[in-house]
UniProtKB/Swiss-Prot annotation:
Superkingdom of source: Bacteria
Organism for this UniProt entry: Neisseria meningitidis serogroup A / serotype 4A (strain DSM 15465 / Z2491)
Gene Ontology MF: a single term: glucose-6-phosphate isomerase activity
Pfam families: PGI
SUPFAM superfamilies: SIS domain (SSF53697)
Alphabetical keyword list: Cytoplasm, Gluconeogenesis, Glycolysis, Isomerase
The protein's name in its UniProt record: Glucose-6-phosphate isomerase 2
Residues at the catalytic site: E351 (proton donor), H382, K508
Cross-referenced InterPro entries: G6P_Isomerase, G6P_Isomerase_C, Phosphoglucose_isomerase_CS, SIS_dom_sf, SIS_PGI_1, SIS_PGI_2
NCBIfam families in alphabetical order: PRK00179.1
Function: Catalyzes the reversible isomerization of glucose-6-phosphate to fructose-6-phosphate.
Recorded GO CC terms: cytosol
Amino acid sequence: MNAFTRAWYALERHYQDTRHVLLRDRFACEPDRFERMHERLDGMLFDYSKNRLGEDTLQLLCRLAETADLEGKMRALRTGAKVNNSEGRAALHTALRLPDGAGAVYADGRDVLPEIRRELNRALKFAHSLDDGSYQGTTGKRITDFVHIGIGGSDLGPAMCVQALEPFRRHIAVHFAANADPACLDEVLCRLNPETTVFCVASKSFKTPETLLNAEAVKAWYRGAGFSESETGCHFCAVSADTEAAQSFGIAAERVFAMYDWVGGRYSVWSPVGLPVMVAVGGARFRELLAGAHAMDSHFFHTPPRRNIPVLMALIAVWYNNFQHADGQTAVPYSHNLRLLPAWLNQLDMESLGKSRASDGSPAACKTGGIVFGGEGVNCQHAYFQLLHQGTRLIPCDFIVPMTAQGVEDGRSRFTVANAFAQAEALMKGKTLDEARAELADLPEAERERLAPHKEFPGNRPSNSILLERLTPYNLGMLMAAYEHKTFVQGVIWDINPFDQWGVEYGKQLAKTIIGELEGGTSVHDASTEGLMAFYRECRLKGGGAA
């Protein structure tokens, strides 16, 4: 039995020994529990004291990380080793946010920092030219709107950042179109003037079908408005690893910005893929976003596991996923501007960790990625929180709470923060049957006994609280990088590759075949798929609609 397996079995035994210990009892017996179980970094506080664990649990989890060679894997990530082994690539998103003056970072024996600096500065310069009006459309009018066309990692990160940083928005309105459903792009175009709009096509391969379909639809929109091909091209820019394909699409080289094959889409907002963020909030604010992410990188790479925020987040998630058999995890930002964070986390975690094969291709030795979902607090308290409080499933919760609202301070911010704190406390403490009876003391005994069981809360429901002094670009960068590194650490513990997504590719392959077959002709699929295709053709014949 190797050291990792021994560490794993030790955690299994520890869970059996401590499974009946209640969180409310831990707090009663450990007055210094919060002091020992929270970490601070700049404007962030991470409280993990409301979790089903003790110091002995943390020691065992850190030992598990040690036997998984977490330190060596972190070094490999930072120095450009090919940690994405299935595709033979590095994963150097941390290099994208290195400050000026940082030492060389190598990928395939080449220092990538000069290229990173060049492309970042080009993108920032273009964003500034839109902002100050020096770049204009073909009719000489100032640009008022910027539409980002991308999907997945080329959409979720930028869209979330633009939404989160709305209070810092400058002059240009930024829009997003991801879905190939015509309603998505049409909803954006109906509000825009083609003379004052610039479109950005973001696709790493420049072959993403949803993105190219929308880009072609925009070209048709310009043709309908009387624009020539060359005039239309002036209203486009692109971000891609295949810069030649972008230029072949009709976009001038000076407006094509490079992505890198050593950065995955869901980690790419720090690259020129973040162009809509640069346009929305300006170059200085974008650099603050990078600086916040770099601060978390430095903390992650140089802090011992027991005090390391992303490592602790990951080990706690492993503790619930693999030893307490949790049914998922929810993330709840108590901030309207952070309402897209759960969708971004959903992709980051589930696309990265939804793997059933170990890094060497053998079957994974344990349960890997879980179901991650979320919603905007306080809204979701009136939706799925009932299940968190009184349901039969274990679903740990992350509360993400800015302390100061980006708006009028009229009591609503205090109400929002109070609700976040109250929900975390209620999940942890619960309400005993006797406490429920005491609340119903004014009722007749029979009625009290009938209602009390329904008002009992089991409690012992775990949560993390991640507090931000304010929702600023810097603090947002720290928050995002913390979750990125958490995802990486979970991949190390489970020995899976968090940087590929082959499961996504298979569906794309089948779709290419089915698209042509929907118009008729020979097709060979299972009976269900054939039936669905037949119904589509039937509806098309009845409606006579366009494809």
